[in-house]
Each structure stands twice: as C-alpha cells, then as structure tokens.
Amino acid sequence: MQQPISIQQPVVNNINNSPNNQANINNNTTNNTNNNNNNNNTTNNIANNNNSNNINNNNEINNSNINNNINNGINNDIDRGGEKKANKLIAKTTKKFNKDMTAYTSGKFFELWRNQVVRDKILGYVRIHNLHYDKRVFKCIDLNNCIDNGADLQQQHNCHRVHNHYHQDLGHNYFGKVSRGIVSLSDYKYYGYLRSVHLIGYEQHEEELIKTIKSLPVGVSTLELSGHLNKIIFKEGSLPTSITNLTISSPTKLGYKSIPSHLKTLKLNSTFNDPLLVQGRLEGQLGIVPLLPIDGAITSLDTGGKFNQPFEAGLLPSSLTELAFGNEYFRPIEVGSLPSGIKSLKLGQRFCLPIPIGSLPIGLTELQLGGTQQNPILTIGCLPPTLTKLTLDNHFNQPLVIGVIPSSLKTMIFGPRYNQPLPPSVFPDSLTHLEFHQNSSYIFPLKLGYNIPSNVSTLLLSFRSQERNVTLGTNSNIKKLRCGGDYLPSLSSDDSTIGAILNSFSSSSSRETFPRSVESLHLNIVNVLDKEINIPSNVTKLIITGNNLQHDGPDVFMVGKKGSKITHLKLRGYEKPICQEMFKNLVNLKSIQFIGAYNHQLGPNCFPPQSITNLEFDCLPSVIPIGSLPSTLKSLRVKSFCTPFLKNSLPSSLLILECAFVRSFIDSYEIVDEIFVEQQAQYAQQQLLQNEQALQAQKQLEIQQQVAQQRLQQLKQQKQQQQQQQDNEQQLDHSIENNDGSIQDDHEHELEEEQENEEEEEDTNNHQHPFLQEAINHNQQLQQKQQEKYLYSSNNSNNYNYNNNSNNNNNNNSNEEDDEEEDLIQPIISKEWLPPSIHTLIIRGEPTIQLPLPESLTNIHIESKNQSILHNIPLMEKISKLVRVFDYESDTNSIFKKSLAICNNINQNQNQNNNNYNNNNNNNNNNNNNKKKNVKK
C-alpha cells in the first residue's frame, strides 16, 4: 500500500533551496562584476533581475509543491478509505501546521482551506464521529474482561473507553453501546476544541487513570473524576497545568500539593472529610502544611456533604469568592477564619451555632442558611452591611427581630418551614423581592407598608393553611404577584401596577378582583371550568392548569371575550376535544401549547385559520388527519409521537418541525387510555382490511394474467399452424419446380425460416394483448395508491431507505409479525411527507430516513445517542452538511427557541429583501423619469 506523502520533507528542501539559489546568483553576480569592470552598471542590473526572477520562481514552485503534497496526501488517504487513517492524517496535518507555523506564510492555511474537497471531507468526518463535542466521558475497562462492574459492551473491538454515559447519569449500573467513532482519549491529543472530560475509573486501573490524566489534551480545562477510587492518592504533578475546573465525585485521597495552584474551581465529593492540614515540606523541612494552595487562584470551593473539619485563619486560599459547606458542617466560625474576599457563603442544615459579629467577610453579598430550631444564630450586627440576598432555607425557623436585616438587603427568601410572625419594619426599605416557599406554612398576617416594604415589586406567596390574611393597598409597586390555593389578596380592580399573577384561583368570586393591567395570568383551576372566564382585557399570556380539567354541560368552553389580546395560550390537563369555536374570540392568538396527553382526534379546521403560527403537544397518540393543522403554522413541536404522518397532513407553510419518535405511547407516559387503545385498534383493523383488499386485487390480477397468457398461447399456436401449412405448400411447389436443388440452398432456406420465427416471437412480445396490458397497468396503479396512502410501507424501492433495523433477518413467523407491528409505529422522514418549505428538523428518537430530502432543509438536529443516523456512514456522507448534534442533557427548549429565532430572522430578511427590492425599483423609476426630463430639456 502506498504510504502517505510527507509534508515536512518538501517544505525543508524547498525552503533550503531558496538561499542556495540566491547564493549562487550572488556569486555569479560578483564574478561578472570583477570580470567586466567597464560594464559594471549593466551587469549588476542583469544579475539583480535574474536574482529576483529566480527567487520568485523558486518560491512559486515551493508553494505549489507544498500545497500539492498536502492536498495529494489528504485526498489520496481519504480516497483509500478508512476512518482511522483519515483521523490520523487530519491530526498529523494539524500538528505540522502548529509546529512549523513560522515556516509558513499566513496564506498557506487559506490555500488548503479553499480546497472544497478537502474541507468537505474534514467536516464530514468531524460530524460522523461527533468530534465537535465540548465534553466527553470515558470509562476505564479491562479488555480481557469485557463485562466489568456491569459495563455491558455490546460491540467488542479495540475500544478502551466508553463515552456513552446516559444510563450512568440516570443512576443505572449499566452502560449503552460503545461508539464506533473514537477508540480512546488519545485520539483527541491534537484537537484543541475539547474543553471538558469526565473520567470514570476503578481501583485496579490506578496507573492507567493517572497516566490518562497526565496525557489529557492541552485544551482541556474542566475535569470530572468518578467511579471507585478509594485507594487512589493524587500527588504533586498528577493534574496537568491546563486544568482550571476540577470535580471529584468519588472518594479519593488528596496529598501534598495535589491541588495545583492554577486551579480556579474545586468541588469535592460528598464523603470528603479529610483535614485541611497534611504532611509536607515547608521551606525544605518536613512539617504540617495546608492542603489547599494559599497563594493559588482558587475562586470557588465546595467541600462536599460530609465535611466537618475545623479550620483556622490562613488554611483557605485568599483568592476565594465562593464557599459552600455541606449539611454535616457545624463547626463555629471564628473571626478572621474566612478570607475577606468571599462574596457568596452557604452553610448547611446542621449549622445551628451563633454567628459572632465580624466573623463574616465585610464584602459578603449572598448568604444561605439551613439551620434548625435549636439555637438562635442571627443577632443584631452579625450580618455584614453589604449583604444584598439572604436565603433562610429548609429547616430555618428562628424569629427575626428588628435590626437584624441590614439596610442593603434587596432579596429575601423563606424556606418551607418558616412560621414565625414578622414584626413591623423588620425589612429595610431597600427590599424589592420577597418570596415564600411554594409549600410554606406561614399563617401570620402580612400587610403592605407594615411588615412588607412598600418598595417591593415582586411578591411570591404560597400557603398550605386555610388561615390567610394578606392586605395589599391600591398604591403598591407590585408588578409580579403569585398566590396559591383558592386565595386572592385584597386588591382593587383599579390597581394598575401589578403586571403578572403567576398562580391563581378556582372560585369565580375571586376573579372579579383581577387588576386591569395584568398581562400574564396563570389560573390554577380545580377540575371544572365555567362556560366563560372573566379575563382582563390586557392579558396577552394565559395559562390554565388543573387535573382532569373539564367544563360543565355540552356548551363549548370559551376563552376570553371579544377583542381579547391573548397571543399565547397554555392548557394543562384539558380533557375535552378542541374546536374552532373555542378560540372564536382570540383573533390575535399565535401560540397554543397542550401540556399532558391529549387523547382526542384532531378534527378538520379545529384551530383558528389565520392566526396560529406555533403549536406544541406533549403527547399526541393519534394520527394527524389531513387539514387539521392551521394553514399558517410555521413551527410544530410534538414531544412524544408514535404514529406515522400521513401524506400532505403537514401544512406547506411549516418551517420548523420537532418530533420525538417513540416506539409506543406507553414508553413515554405510564398511562393507558381507552380512547388511545380504541384508536390503535381501529387503525390496525383498517390496515388489515386494506392488506386483505390488496391481496384480493393481486389474486384477481394473477387470474387475469393467466387467462391472458392462455389466450396468447392459443393465438400463437394458431398462427404457427397457419404458417406451417403455408411453408409446407411452398416446399411442395419448390420441390416440383426445382428437382435439381442443392443441399446448400436447403440450408439457407432453413436459416431464413429460423430468422422469421425469431422476428415473429419478438413481435408477439412487443405487442402484447390489450387485456394483459390493461391488467398490468391496473396492478401498477394499485401499488402506487397504496404507497401514497401509507408512507410507512416498505415496497418503495426507488428511494434510499436507511433503517437501523434492516440488518435483523428473522425467519420465524412470530418475528415477522412483530416486525410488521413495529413498522406500523415506525415513522419515515422523506421528501414525500415533509412540507416543501421546511428548513429545520429536530429529531428525537430513531425514525427511518428516506432520501432525497427537501431542498429547503438546512438543519437537522439529532440527539447524541441517535445510533441509526450517526453510525450509518453512507447516510451521514449524504446529509453531513445538514446534521447538527445536541446532547440529551441539553435543554431542547433552547434549541427550539433558537430555531424559532432563525425562522423569525429568515422572515425578517425576506421582508427586508423585498423592501430593498421595492426601494431599488422605485429609485430606478425615479432615475429614469429624471433622465427623460433632462432629455426633454
């Protein structure tokens, strides 16, 4: 096999040739000058011209050789195939560029990058192997024991790491399939984009783990260690200098100078309880030294849940700005023990000791206390005057006295167990955010201007008790209000300051007190809806939640009144079928979201026809009929969908589609609905009937074909008999007339007869009987109709069909029946059922993909665990430019919002282009008119 062309050799030789050529030219120049003194000026000019021409020619040759060698090496190796060779070649070229950057000019990179073939190959392999991830997870395994501590390796090859950590994050004790792309962490050695690594190790792989940590790529700045590392001791130099964020999630031992001074963030495991003083060397002598680097760069430290060791002044780094103690910490805080630069401090649930005055840093801005009911821990003057946020979390239930809260406080948050009366003026006037836990048991009176400052703009209340007494005046500054249960504070309907009620009420009497200025309204309604809800006219966002939400009577539940400004509607637990009359008053409605399983068939024209652009379903078990979605829809999101799309069921205006293709409805939600079961049964019966009809039609067609073939054979036999009689008569006449004929003439006559027979057979094959041709056409029409009606059928052989289950060959009848049932709920992504204008497709699950796809499609977002697409090399080579991979841990809502933003930008750009086009036309018309006027003048 031909070896790849080296890059360095021609570079060195060509670069070294240029000075030699220049030296030779200079020598020739001096010789000519000494020999021809009379023609000194002329000779120098000629030599200089030759010198410059030779140097330029050599440089051009060198540049072309370098580029040709690079491109030929990459193209030849990629064309020969082999993922591993391509990765090595890319890594090699990257290393050469980094090492010999001084020898290259700034234009060499662009000369390589402008090679479209090379660039497309590089980007294709990057997407195929998911090399563009910011974070990777690797697990040490034993190749001799492919099953180690529950690590189920379904594909055994030379892979040393498992980076599919989906099950591990869910608390499972097994792992998924090993990826075929990256074989070890060493493959990332020359890649600078890898920033975060999660290593899962075991005690028996201590040496390998330490070696792996030391050989991490240069760009890695975040490292997380987990697994069984009880006996592993980290010593000086164990961590590379590039690590700035370290998380140790497993029990480990930290030795002298094991924490590097360049570390910025350190999070220890939940079982860490070692002293902060260790045995080490100080000024060349053995002694007790601090574990953490005092003069280091650590800014954030989390000691873990079990830490309960004393510390003195100087043991914590002076650079700390964030410090968090776990729930087991209950040591006293001495004055001066905490660094003065700390801005955020967290104390756990067991901390119940008094806080001495001056013990907290003078610059502290955020404080979180767990506390118990034993001893008072807050006294007057213990909190610094710079505090802006105070959280009394979980078990804290100590009374607050006047003067404890500093005058700088802006945010106050109470936990679920706080139930102490708040005296008047306990909070300063600077307070703007007051929040009680959603399950708070606070039962004492609250009054604006008494124990609630008048400057509060956000008030979040939630009560479990029935005794409530909250008074809010008409001149309040509250812009956001949340209440729980069936309770509404005393408000005036003319209050124009409240901008949002986040959680509200079920009784109709309390709805009369909604302020007119409310723009966002969240109704928490118990089971039954009234026929109409009195919603303020300025509300633009409406959320209605409840369990088994229904309405009384056969009348349609009306949302809002005429002239309503609602643009976004969210329904949770709505159990009635929706219809267009339900949204009759919502002329400005643009977005509808159904939370929970919607177990009804979507009817035709059930949504407003000219306003809806965004539609979301948590679960949609039924088939989407043709014409049920609004014609103006631009984005559709279905979190769980298990039935195939029908052709033309998606509107042509759709730009963004997000669908989570699940194998069954029960996989996503642990409920079985009778309506859904009936719909699935009806759907299966319809499919069986259609299959039976297709079989009957095929049998009839076969019978018709047999009859037609028999008729053709009869006609052919008759024609042959007639032809044979004519031949016999001709032979008889010929024998009488030519008795002296030769054998050669007879042989030629036989050859002519054979040719005539062959021509007759071809004529009969080309000109079939009309009845047979009609039967064949009828069969083709039946097959075409069946393919158009149900796109999940696998009879279409014209398209490329990439199915992850295509390799499973089952010989048993039971397995074939199971495969047929799986095909019923296996959707297909193809050009036939996607709208022609779609540009973004978000796939969750593993559907079947048929090529070609719509030409307007520019982005395909898939999950990192999608095996059917990422590991299908022929498919990825064709759609690699469209694929964008997102991790399962990421928030899909953010991806959906980004896609919506792209959609809006496209619309804005189109409008802007149209406006620019119109403006240009107007300018051209004006210019033409001016020219005509000038000509007339």
From Swiss-Prot:
Keywords from the named record: Coiled coil, Repeat
Biased composition (Polar residues): 1-12
FNIP repeats (start-end): 307-350, 354-394, 396-439, 598-640
Highest taxon, organism lineage: Eukaryota
Biological source species: Dictyostelium discoideum (Social amoeba)
Biased composition (Low complexity): 13-60, 719-729, 794-814, 910-929
InterPro entries per the UniProt record, alphabetical: FNIP, STK_FNIP-Repeat
Lineage of origin: Eukaryota, Amoebozoa, Evosea, Eumycetozoa, Dictyostelia
Coiled-coil annotated residue ranges, if any: 677-769, 902-937
Comp. bias regions, Acidic residues: 751-763
Region entry Disordered, spans: 1-60, 719-767, 794-823, 910-937
Protein name: FNIP repeat-containing protein DDB_G0271996
Any Pfam family hit: FNIP
